[in-house]
Amino acid sequence: MKHEFARKLRRDQTDVERKLWFALRSRQFGGFKFRRQQPIGPYIVDFVCFEASLILELDGGQHGSDYGVAYDLKRTQFLGKNGFKVVRFPNHEINSEFDNVLNAITHHLRNPLSLPLWERTQNLALSEAYAKLSA
């Protein structure tokens, strides 16, 4: 069932997913193989590079809601516990700062254990938001 849904998501990808996939597909991004709309555990991730244990998530407007923040945190924690590094990009960055997004992906592929300050801050904000929702 989940695999059929993943197949549907691949068929019906958004414009930003299509734009990023065009840059990542066929090992043309630094020789790394990415998969799109890949089931991992109970989730379907937007893009994954298994050899780098890197997941890329593209976040639309729904991710800013209280529920979206809590869900993303739970999902990121699950994926992290299973050995993946999750990097999130808001959809507007794909459209307006695409070169910066590609540079950030390159950085994460070359430095799999490093988290830039902005990402550490974002993860802290997600944790605080989740704590408020759990209280």
Short names for language-model regions:
Residues 32-33, 84:
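A generic structural motif
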Residues 28, 37-38, 62-63:
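Glutamine-centric residue-chemistry signal
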